[in-house]
Amino acid sequence: MGREQRQFIQMIAALTMLIDHIGMVFFPSAIGFRAIGRLSFPLFAFGIAEGVRYTHRFWRYFGRILLTAVLSQPIYMLLFGITQGNPLFMLAWGAAALYFFRQGKRAVAAVLLIGSYFADMSYGWYGVWTIFCFGLYVERESLCFYGQLLLNILYGLKTRAWIQLLSLFSFGFLD
């Protein structure tokens, strides 16, 4: 995947997230905004997985995500009235799990993957596992898609947020 395609994916992710958040704040009963917004997270997760894959200084990359998470947490809490960790904490967690897996430290990765179920952060285990799936994307595209399908079904069973299944359409941007 070339640089221009990665930038296009980042732009689509940001735009669909903006639409989702506009809907959440200003039009909470308009489901269309939320439906469009379902495309954003998998694209961000893909970007994190690609970042882990290509960065030469993982801990600097990880630190930037974590610092942004800490600095944006008060705004997130104020704007959305939510006390759980914002999605950037989950992105950092997922990046760490994937990094340790790629470094051959499978036990550490497993602890992070399992531990994500108990963490109080936006997208939680679903988000961490989504990043992990996308980390395997390069070599196993169909496995990633079916892994995402399974994650979405499990997420739907746990949260009743079946709208998240629409996130599978994000794969259309990754070809």
Task: Describe the residue ranges of each PLM region.
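Alpha-helical transmembrane segments and their immediate juxtamembrane cytosolic regions
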Residues: 1-175
